[in-house]
């Protein structure tokens, strides 16, 4: 459990929360599944849990329904070490639920139940905790939070308050079912990118954001859009990170995949860890890649996030992972 008294936050995330209902049978469609596990979910929430597991203070600006699943989310956040001070309760909308199917190694269909909308998309600019946003060491926003009003305006308010401070992160986290079109998503992301310092996404998300799926071209395009650090996740092909001065590419960690859905959020939490600890870019991306790989070997997302000893053990188990470093200027 976490105390209600705290210093300024290390990591403050904003956006999606819900309950993940994942099958306990693999290789079986939902119509034939007979048992499920229930877990805290939502990408920004998972990132906060990942950061908390790595000994950082973390909180989420979000909202849940006034229902059993909402109470579960808040209780589970506290159990996992994440402050729930900024979790609102919406009495009109239910807490979202997400189902998935598990077909390893690379097919994990998702089914989101967030209609007509979700409480986390009803956050308004007045709900933004300005002091927390201003003072957090890392502010982590998600593209999904830009898909509807008033959440879009709330995210813009957070960025206005933040003032492009160091470690203002946009997770490209593109889910097509939440948007009218990819063009609408691109328009929203294009308006926000100049106000963040870090952008992270996979190749498909980069194509939506900047029109490039080639990792190097995507990274350059993100830098040209105004970020200072671009991270392109390539799944089984590794991870690329680039600043104006440096390019780092880390080969993938060899694993047997169970469920890849939480890998990106674990990577994000470890990216936060490296930034907060002042690690080199190569060290940070190596750890982020290893963290993502470790969670991909597990069923769930939030409760699968590694502790620092688990992360270091994973890295020690694979000491020969290729790391390419290049100084660009």
Language-model features: where?
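Conserved phosphate-binding/catalytic region of the ribokinase-like
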Residues: 1-12, 160-161, 211-329
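Glycine-rich phosphate/adenosyl-contacting loop at the front of the ribokinase-like
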Residues: 1-83, 256-258, 322-329
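Active-site metal-binding loops of divalent metal-dependent hydrolases
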Residues: 15-17, 172, 266
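Short beta-strand scaffold segments in enzyme catalytic cores
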Residues: 49, 97-101, 238-241
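Short, conserved phosphate/pyrophosphate- and ester-handling motifs at nucleotide-, phospho-/glycolipid
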Residues: 51, 202, 264
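Conserved N-terminal subdomain of the carbohydrate kinase-like
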Residues: 57-143, 168, 312-329
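Conserved beta-alpha-beta core of the PfkB/ribokinase-like small-molecule kinase fold
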Residues: 138-221, 237-239
